[in-house]
């Protein structure tokens, strides 16, 4: 993907077709699913030798991975009825992804087996509290081939919310597929949630081996993401992810640009400090933000904390709980994951 030259035209969501409205009315408030997660499905291989370079790793632990998969898994762990919309390969790792989701109670009826592609893999290490080397093996992987043929309006209407993570706007195919899902969602009254989940390497902005870099400014990516924001009900991201969505490295300026484009609730993740939730006007200064404080823990691994945070926030948001409750679960879920080795299996249950 040449993000700077990216030009994809998708018609905006149309007026609600009658069938989607009728389907939504049929279910009313009691839809079969709380949330459908569309996006990355992968297998993570975490190095066991903490403090070592990837070059020096001699053994790895295998976990479910991919941001959308992690969120679907986490939502199920926290008591929500979640489903995954993606593709996996017709091989051992694809079966592993499906079976891990099923063990957590995730609906896998729309996890499609792609016989032409392999499941994406990620190799990760924990060198120290600031250094987490990782390599994405995702070239033409199965989940990037997810298609408009893999779902219909009724499936999207069966959920109260649709979540899409940022990588699935990064190619012509995934953008078209995601926008079709959004169109169905808007027609059915299904809430649209976007976790920006910005990985520069997955937008073609850095070398394939540089999976660790979390931010590279790109006007092309910013403009592209800004075509999605007007359709959202909830947007979540770190400061760097808000920077790419808003097209500015000044957080307040970026937030204001996002707000110009959408009336969505914005959740700004602030790492160990906690988070802030913005429903309306953006304040003039960062000091004016109301920060919901994070939980102090000994950090082992920050990778995947954002996915756990998102699952924790959605647990309350989809139950119409207040910001304080939503953020308490979100911050606690993220904190528990950073204190553990993997991601998906580290996401706490509601009891935890």
Show which residues each predicted segment covers.
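Glycine-rich phosphate/adenosyl-contacting loop at the front of the ribokinase-like
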Residues: 2-107, 130, 146, 298-300
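Conserved phosphate-binding/catalytic region of the ribokinase-like
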Residues: 2-36, 183-187, 247-352
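A short, aliphatic-rich alpha-helical micro-motif
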Residues: 30, 155-157, 228-229
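Short glycine/proline- and charge-enriched loop/turn segments
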Residues: 51-58, 208-212, 290-293
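Short, conserved phosphate/pyrophosphate- and ester-handling motifs at nucleotide-, phospho-/glycolipid
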Residues: 75, 238, 306
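Conserved N-terminal subdomain of the carbohydrate kinase-like
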Residues: 81-166
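Hydrophobic beta-strand scaffold residues
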Residues: 82, 108, 192-194, 266
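Conserved beta-alpha-beta core of the PfkB/ribokinase-like small-molecule kinase fold
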Residues: 161, 167-257, 264, 273-275, ...
């Amino acid at each position: 993907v040449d993000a700077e030259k990216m030009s994809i035209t998708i018609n905006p969501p149309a007026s609600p077709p009658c069938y989607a409205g009728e389907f939504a009315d049929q279910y009313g408030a009691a839809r079969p699913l709380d949330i459908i997660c569309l996006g990355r499905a992968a297998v993570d291989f975490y190095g066991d030798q903490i403090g070592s370079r990837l070059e020096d790793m001699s053994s790895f632990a295998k976990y479910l991975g991919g941001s959308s998969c992690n969120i679907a898994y986490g939502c199920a762990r926290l008591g929500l009825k979640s489903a995954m919309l993606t593709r996996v390969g017709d091989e051992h790792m694809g079966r592993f992804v499906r079976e891990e989701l099923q063990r957590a109670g995730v609906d896998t009826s729309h996890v499609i087996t792609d016989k032409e592609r392999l499941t994406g893999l990620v190799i990760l290490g924990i060198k120290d509290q600031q250094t987490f080397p990782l390599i994405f093996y995702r070239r033409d992987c199965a989940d990037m081939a997810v298609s408009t043929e893999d779902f219909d309006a009724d499936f999207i209407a069966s959920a109260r919310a649709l979540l899409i993570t940022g990588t699935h706007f990064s190619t012509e195919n995934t953008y078209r597929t995601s926008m079709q899902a959004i169109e169905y969602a808007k027609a059915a009254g299904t809430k649209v949630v976007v976790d920006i989940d910005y990985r520069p390497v997955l937008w073609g902005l850095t070398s394939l081996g540089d999976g660790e870099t979390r931010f590279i400014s790109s006007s092309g990516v910013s403009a592209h993401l800004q075509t999605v924001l007007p359709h959202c009900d909830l947007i979540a991201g770190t400061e760097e992810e808000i920077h790419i969505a808003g097209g500015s490295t000044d957080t307040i300026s970026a937030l204001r640009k996002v707000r110009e484009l959408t009336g969505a609730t914005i959740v700004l993740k602030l790492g160990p400090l906690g988070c802030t939730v913005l429903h309306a006007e953006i304040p003039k200064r960062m000091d004016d933000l109301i920060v919901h404080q994070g939980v102090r823990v000994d950090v082992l691994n920050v990778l995947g904390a954002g996915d756990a945070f998102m699952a924790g926030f959605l647990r309350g948001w989809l139950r119409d709980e207040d910001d304080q409750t939503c953020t308490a679960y979100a911050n606690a879920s993220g904190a528990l994951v950073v204190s553990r080795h993997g991601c998906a299996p580290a996401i706490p249950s509601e009891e935890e």
